[in-house]
Amino acid sequence: MTIFKAASPEGTRDKLFAECLRLRGIRSSLMELFSSRSYKEIMTPELEYYDLFVRAENPLPQETMFKLVDRSGRLLVMRPDCTAPIARLVASHFKDAEGPFRLCYDETVFRSAAGLDGADSELPQCGVELIGAPGLRGDIEIVSLAVDAVRSAGLRDFRLELGHADFFFGLTEELGLSREDEEALRACIESRSFALLDELVAGYSGEAAQCLRRLPYLFGGPEILDEAAALTSNPRALAAVERLRDIWRELVSAGRGDCISFDLGLVQGLDYYTGVIFRCWTPGAPSSVLAGGRYDRLLCDFGLELAGAGFAVYVGALASCFECPEPEAAKTLIFYESGCLAEAVALLGGGAELSCFATEAESLEYARRAGMKLLVVSKNGIKEVDPNV
């Protein structure tokens, strides 16, 4: 039997100094931004009941979840998503409170990456959830904060793509598609499988079918909204276009329009989202660095009629966009005599470290090998010793 003692599990890896500094810096910048916008940090357990993630609206396949059993035989999972646990938290702790609730988090989700070479199973995320703000202003707040979040991490070359779930659902509703056909159509659009898309829509005629055929091509600048509106007279789809236009106008007036584009074929996770959808891309990142949207039905599962919107920043993907130098090695070694620890500790900082050697001579030899200067702290004071003399 192979003993896996010196290796980390598939989808996980050790992270060393420079990467840790980069990740910590991004997380700190994001959480500081969220706090400045009155979002309050919460934490949910890394272990949750499996039942929380198997609702009809849940887009996460159960095979991606890490499962285990508690001592009572109940099925648990390592948290594969942050939004559903936060919905549970709101229902448990704020059921009788008046919203809106502005919540933020810095947590890790766990998803099996089996079969995906190099993919991570541990995914650090920082994100926000705005609960109880159903209208346009809630959408604007979340989308503008998403732009500011990416900028606060130091990224300048990025595109935030906006879409809307109701554009797709308005068209499929008009055609009277079954849930199975709707999901098959969504998968084709997501994967840009144009031939299969034509095949699925071939049995339908009319304006809605033609518009669905065009859906994978409806991406670009604000002119795409005009093109989309010209393709359909469906009220639900047109309302979605107008909502995107309203968000766009406000972002432009706030100086955040230069990084915005539109993708009406943005249909990932449509079982989850009910309104605006967005994700952020940047050159050099292996995947999107941020994703979010509106999910007004999620809280209904917990008996609350509250709208929700939010996003998650994928910290690992974002960190891969930056170079981070290795932390500098200590330049000063401090040897202290017995009874002088307090004085020695007061000298730490700025690239100094305490000597672990028992004698000044051993400390001097180590400092020579490491190219450090040596400070000796005694009851007579502090002296600097040149290791090379």
Model-derived regions: residue spans:
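TRNA-binding/sensing appendages of the translation machinery
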Residues: 1-84, 140, 161
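Positively charged, Gly/Ser-enriched RNA/tRNA-binding surfaces
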Residues: 19-37, 48-49, 83-95, 103-155, ...
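Beta-rich nucleic-acid/ligand-interaction surfaces
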Residues: 44-62, 163-173, 266-274, 362-365
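Acidic, His- and aromatic-enriched active-site or binding-groove loops in soluble protein domains
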Residues: 64-70, 176-199, 256
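Short, basic, helix/turn surface patches
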Residues: 67-78, 187-190, 378-389
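Hydrophobic mid-domain F-helix/FG-region of cytochrome P450s
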Residues: 145-152, 166-176
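Extended alpha-helical scaffolds
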Residues: 152-160, 165-168, 181, 195
